[in-house]
Every structure is written in C-alpha cells, then in structure tokens.
Amino acid sequence: MTTNDSWFTEHFQATGSAIGFRITGKLDEVQSPFQKIEIYNSTDWGKLMVIDGALMLTSRDNFLYHEMISHPALFTHTAPKCVVIIGGGDCGTLREVLKHPDIEQVTQCDIDEQVTRMAEKHFPELCTSNNDPRATLLFSDGVAYMTDCPTNSVDVIIVDSTDPVGPAKGLFNRTFYESCFRALKNDGLLVQQSESPLALLELIKEMRHEMSKAGFKAFKTLPFPQPCYPTGWWSVTLSSKQPNANFAFRQTDAQTKPFDTLYYNAHLHHGVLVPPPFIAHALGE
C-alpha cells in the first residue's frame, strides 16, 4: 500500500497488479489488538475501509460482495432459520441476511470489535440491522466459536473473512471446516469468500480440497464483479454435506423476495450457476 496527498494505491504481489483510488484525506485510524484499521474519503468511491494496508470495502461497490455472499446460499437452502456469520465485522453481510423475514437467529462472530465500531461510525448504512432482536454480535475468535458450536444446530454458515493471512488464516483449513461440518444440520450449507477466480484458482482448489477432507461432498463456486479487489473479479464457494447436491435454488422465492437488492436477483442466480469454461475445467465441474 502507498498513499500520497491524492491517491491510495494497493499493490497485489500475487497478481502482479495494483489498484488506486483518488482520495481527499484520511478520516480515521485505529490500531486494534489485531490489526490497523483506516478510513479514507475518496472522490468517486465514497469511503474506503483499509485493514493492514488492504482495501476491504468502498461505499460504492460493497453491495456486490455482501449480496453475493448472502442471498445465493440463503435461497439455495430449503428453509434457513439459524445462520452463523464468521467474520463480517463491517456488518454488511448481517444486514443482507436479516432482510430474509423467515430467519430467526443470526450469530455474528468477529475477532475484532474495532472493525464493527468503525463501520458503525463511518458506514452506518451497513449497520442498520445491528440492533435487530434476531442478531447476536460476538467479538471473539471465530475458530474457537465454531469448535464449541453445538452439533447439528446451524442451517447456513457464512465465512465473511479477510484474505487467508493474519487473524483469518485459521479459517481456511481442514480443522475449521470439520467444526463447520459438525455444526451444520444435514441439509446445511457453508459459504465462504474464495478470492479471485481469475488469479487465484489454485487457492480455490485448495479450499475445496480442505473442505472435502472435512467431509463436505459437493461444491459450487460463484464468480461476480468486485472492482475494488484484485483483478476486479471475486467469488464465493458454497459447500454441501449432501453428495448429490446440485445447488438448485428456490427460484420463485428469489423472484418474489420481499426486499430490494442492487445486484442479486433470480435471473442472475440462475446464470452464475453456470461457470465460465476455464473455471469449470480448473475445478472439474
């Protein structure tokens, strides 16, 4: 990461690329026990949240990520009631999950309370569901939370984490996935952000391999645009305990959903289930 008087620039060694945003200044900064969190104001992308030099979200395009990590999984499950979010400290995913009126309980566990406090201060539009009576916000280790989570108690687990480094490294291995597998009901789903399908397919393959070793039987990776992330293209990966899962979704419910979205709809969901040939070939679909 580099900054000067007018630009925030993030360099991506893994992809040999960089991305920049014209800024008007730094609005806030806090050093938590886990990471440094910075907020910048930009000329065209609203506010930026940066953690340890890596851009996490912008006001302008965060809806893409938050909608795609939430709604496909929730409309794929037949009747989700209980959801766990690991990570998700900016609370945008929590907001999207709680748009579903039949959800009864959501527990969000993020290791760093300061991410949520900074989001409440600078991205209040993401935090409109923080006081929903169905929501419980915990600030502790997500790996430990899943280790202690009761068996067969959760319908959907959403792993809304940073990249697999630092505090999030433990969310990308077999041990963590075994805890998720045990906590999910038989028809439960795990969905996790899975990086860029254009540049990091090997990481997605490794994630699926670790999930498979933990017991998951079927997988589907859904790509979507994300301009502020490396390559401008991102993905989430759904995992099922059922060997014959085809990830068909409740299309009528998605078409008649009683809430607004900016990116997700039933037609898009249907299309994203068909991967581009290079992804299908690499992932054996």
Curated annotation (Swiss-Prot):
UniProt catalytic activity: S-adenosyl 3-(methylsulfanyl)propylamine + putrescine = S-methyl-5'-thioadenosine + spermidine + H(+)
Gene3D superfamilies: Spermidine synthase, tetramerisation domain, Vaccinia Virus protein VP39
Binding sites annotated in the UniProt record for spermidine: 66, 90, 160-163
Binding site for S-methyl-5'-thioadenosine: 35, 110, 141-142, 167
Pfam families per UniProt: Spermine_synt_N (PF17284), Spermine_synth (PF01564)
A GO molecular-function annotation: spermidine synthase activity
Subcellular compartments: Cytoplasm
BP GO terms, sorted: spermidine biosynthetic process
Signal peptide (residue range): none
Pathway: Amine and polyamine biosynthesis; spermidine biosynthesis; spermidine from putrescine: step 1/1
The UniProt record lists the keyword Transferase: yes
PROSITE patterns to which the protein is assigned, alphabetical: PABS_1, PABS_2
Cellular component per GO, a single term: cytosol
This enzyme's EC code(s): 2.5.1.16
Domain called PABS: residue spans: 5-241
Keywords tagged on the record: Cytoplasm, Polyamine biosynthesis, Spermidine biosynthesis, Transferase
Membership in a protein family: Belongs to the spermidine/spermine synthase family.
Assembly behavior: Homodimer or homotetramer.
Function recorded in the entry: Catalyzes the irreversible transfer of a propylamine group from the amino donor S-adenosylmethioninamine (decarboxy-AdoMet) to putrescine (1,4-diaminobutane) to yield spermidine.
Protein's recorded name: Polyamine aminopropyltransferase
